Amino acid sequence: MSQHVMFNAVLSSHPALFIQGEWRIGNGVSFEKQDPMSQQRLWQARAADHTDVTLACHAARAAFPAWARASLEQRATVIQQFAALLEQHKQSLARTISLETSKPYWETLTEVQAMIGKVAISLQAYQTRTGHSQTPMGDSMSVLRHRPHGVLAVFGPYNFPGHLPNGHIVPALLAGNTVVFKPSELTPWTAEETVKLWQEAGIPDGVLNLVQGGRETGEALAAQPDIDGLLFTGSAHTGYHLHRQLAGQPEKMLALEMGGNNALIVEQVKDRDAVVNLAIQSAFISAGQRCTCSRRLLVKTGAEGDAFLLRFTAVAQALRIGRWDEQPAPFMGAVISSQAAERMLAAQQHLLLLGGESLLNMTRPDSQSALLTPGIIDITNISEVPDEEYFGPLVSVIRYTDFTEALKIANQTRFGLAVGLVSEDRQQFEQLLLEARAGIVNWNKPLTGASSAAPFGGVGASGNHRPSAFYAADYCAWPMASLECEHLTLPATLSPGISFDLPKV
């Protein structure tokens, strides 16, 4: 796999779309990706316009019958070859992800490893969630099968540009769907390099297509009559827009995995540094750019809570931040873009103007970089707290008096992705399980910890239940129920009102 650390301007028309098994130059506007740390151009190409998107969808539609009729073993062979190529190019792809996202190299290596692991998990999920089963019913058989939707559009996010779209593409292809993949315009290079591996793995022409671009490309794809469903991972704002765009089209499957305004409740625990480490991992890993990051840190009032916050603030202030390949390795890098950095600083200023108290001021050490330092704001005294997902290294502290109040505060959000509890009291966790309105409920584990072998997703503004991880299989195939009998015979007992005691013709 090539490593184009920086494209020259003459490569603005390099073929970055993959349609019908061919790399093509887009007909849309030229756009580029900059290194979040240095602002140097990493990648540049032309976006897909409406014509390109239509062509990609037509290619996927034409390829669908043969791919759907191929055996599961045939489809799995291609997907397993893709996994083998990921293993072979793990370091190269991890470097590409690090360059585009600014995530440290140690973190992007784990992302590529998760992409590899997704193949085996998807095979298991396909059999468990959407396989073939039959139940005897007297002289017949009740049979359950699953069938692919057809053409699925996959919209990928920028925070995990390899792992998260991979979590939809792999199960979609395994189930027999064909795919049109639209990655985030902030991570086009990772998508391009990943699709090259699919091509090398032998994916048939038209089965997987790549369209690059921003909002216009996404809207064109969502509006295509040739798609049968759409799998989306990203912000609630964009997810709501897609939901409105597909309104009135119940024939199209729409799966939305969006963000969260997640709460981490901190009760008393003996090992204070263990709690601080968990809170740091929950709030600031990936520079706070995970949908499960804790945006709200609920800390009990009193001396123990005060001591925890002092230690938490000190450790956050001392976190090593920097370029993805620096040594010693940083804990976190920059946010995805200068615009994202500006939005985070504006969010901090807004909370301070509302009456928040800064415990640790988030700063931008270099105006020419998207690198931010961690920020902590006590918003306990704000009367009307904005219910927003601030997607970056900024966490809000809310003090509470008792556990009942903490539960109430945790549920005061339109989102419902994740909530966590740090406590040595099992009964408190049992109460949280009963009252939490969230798809992920963790106990003494970071909010950002999740298993690909479990469902992933949330309720409310966090999405329509579990379209990611193990349950992604559910959204990639529809159930077909059959009653089957090999030999038709007249029943021994007829329904009332029916008689065959008639002269035969």
From Swiss-Prot:
Specify the superkingdom: Bacteria
Q: Would I find NAD among this entry's keywords?
A: yes
**Coiled-coil region:** none
InterPro entries xrefs: Ald_DH/histidinol_DH, Ald_DH_C, Ald_DH_CS_CYS, Ald_DH_CS_GLU, Ald_DH_N, Aldehyde_DH_dom, SuccinylGlu_semiald_DH_AstD
* Functional pathway: Amino-acid degradation; L-arginine degradation via AST pathway; L-glutamate and succinate from L-arginine: step 4/5
Pfam families per the record? Aldedh (PF00171)
Q: Which NCBIfam families match?
A: arg_catab_astD, PRK09457.1
HAMAP family (UniProt xref): Aldedh_AstD (MF_01174)
Q: What is this protein called?
A: N-succinylglutamate 5-semialdehyde dehydrogenase
What is the primary gene name for this protein? Answer: astD
